[in-house]
């Protein structure tokens, strides 16, 4: 039996938890507040512009000509995983967890184009930390009864001609393997 939690998070977007709860244990994914991280105001560029939000909260323009009006760092996104209290011996304590992170570009002027995984606490990666990717798919060792915290950064591509507050969305799924 697999347990799946699905959470949408965003940069200046709302976090939404969509979880079907079977009668087994569960993994709950908590993402940052709706404004974490927020790039702030952007002045329009003439070509697509990529901003990198590092796992430390630093913001760097990698390409393009849009301008971020603030030089301040942002709060880096942090994912927290917790396990429900039912059937822990069969699931949370002994089963690996697969995490899938996917950008959602529909209805936004900016999109997440790359995920960067940083520090992890409470468990470890199966097979080592994942490489940066546009869609992230990796496994964690069993988390037991504790809380797992994963810091990550993102690359955000802002479309040409866009200005104002930048909104992006992404989805995180957690499944027992």
Per-segment meaning from a language model:
Residues 19-20:
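N-terminal signal peptide c-region/cleavage motif recognized by signal peptidases
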Residues 112-120:
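Short, surface-exposed beta-strand/strand-loop-strand elements in extracellular ectodomains
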Residues 122-141:
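Extended, solvent-exposed segments with strong compositional bias
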Residues 1-11:
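Bacterial N-terminal signal peptides that target proteins for export
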Residues 7, 99-101, 107, 122, ...:
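Intrinsically disordered/low-complexity terminal segments and short unstructured peptides
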Residues 23-106, 137-177:
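N-terminal small/polar-rich segments of proteins
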